[in-house]
Amino acid sequence: MHLTSREQEKLMLFLAGELAAKRKARGVKLNYPETIAYIASHLQEAARDGMSVAEVMQYGSTLLTVDDVMEGVAEMVHEVQIEATFPDGTKLVTVHNPIR
């Protein structure tokens, strides 16, 4: 199987997001890379599920709270940006201050 660099990047993001989700489910507080991967992978899946750009942006701000991440991580994450594949094409999605 041959994957383009973009496909490889999406796959790595998915895997990192899955690892972060498993850790979160076990009650482990997420570090910075895990936090970004968790949010970004959920945004990718929401776009593929057919949500609009506005819905994905709103959804992204509901995924994690300050209690889900290590101390200081919420202050480090000002925004998460991804290129998500929607039914009508690829679009840039930005979620500002995603951890509330």
Swiss-Prot record:
Localization annotation: Cytoplasm
Key words of the record: Cytoplasm, Hydrolase
Listed CDD domains: Urease_gamma (cd00390)
Leading EC class: hydrolase
Pfam families attached to this UniProt entry: Urease_gamma
Pathway terms, separated by semicolons: Nitrogen metabolism; urea degradation; CO(2) and NH(3) from urea (urease route): step 1/1
Annotated protein name in UniProt: Urease subunit gamma
Record lineage: Bacteria, Pseudomonadati, Pseudomonadota, Gammaproteobacteria, Pasteurellales
Chain's gene name: ureA
